[in-house]
């Protein structure tokens, strides 16, 4: 038996997903960042390494507040596995662009590696992906968005 139960890690991972969904919807990434321990490390293959909860928060808040992150509000999980002996969670995360107006789905995935600390906290995250795979997906999304008639959202409700 590991240090943590599978149920404890599953619940922490479920909370991680809930907070990512809420933060993607609201634009406030503080609740999501608060899942990390104060000394957590985050490795992001395009942006580099962040050390500490506050550095992770500053990075995620800025990244998801500017394009293209600001148009990427959903992060559904395709699959996940848990190693309860060591406290690891591995998952495939879709980085999904908002609906461009025609209902089409534009997304690209990364593999996320999480290390569970305890008390619902995460001490390590690494997102492994090829940034070059995102460019064609975003280009296709932009093409559809440009051809979709403007709705009240793009006219400020006028």
How should each PLM-predicted stretch be described?
Residues 109-141:
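Short beta-strand edge/turn micro-motifs at domain boundaries
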Residues 61, 92-98:
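Generic short beta-strand segments
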Residues 54, 101-104, 133-140:
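A short, polar/proline- and glycine-enriched secondary-structure boundary/capping micro-motif
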Residues 41, 104, 120-121:
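Residue-level signal for well-ordered, solvent-exposed loop/turn and beta-edge residues enriched
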Residues 1-34, 38, 144-158:
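Short, low-complexity N-terminal intrinsically disordered segments enriched in polar/charged residues
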Residues 74-76, 105-112:
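Short, surface-exposed coil-to-beta transition loops
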Residues 6, 29-88:
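A solvent-exposed, acidic/Ser-Thr-rich amphipathic alpha-helical stretch
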């Amino acid at each position: 038996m590991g240090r943590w139960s599978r149920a404890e890690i599953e619940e922490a991972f479920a909370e991680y997903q809930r907070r990512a969904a809420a933060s993607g919807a609201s634009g406030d990434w503080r609740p999501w960042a608060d899942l990390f321990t104060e000394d957590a490390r985050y490795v992001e293959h395009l942006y580099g390494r962040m050390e500490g909860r506050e550095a992770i928060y500053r990075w995620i808040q800025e990244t998801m507040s500017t394009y293209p992150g600001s148009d990427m509000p959903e992060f559904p999980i395709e699959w996940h596995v848990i190693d309860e002996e060591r406290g690891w969670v591995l998952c495939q995360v879709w980085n999904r662009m908002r609906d461009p107006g025609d209902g089409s789905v534009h997304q690209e995935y990364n593999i996320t590696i999480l290390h569970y600390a305890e008390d619902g906290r995460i001490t390590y995250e690494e997102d492994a992906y090829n940034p070059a795979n995102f460019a064609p997906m975003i280009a296709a999304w932009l093409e559809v968005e440009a051809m979709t008639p403007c709705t009240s959202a793009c006219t400020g409700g006028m």
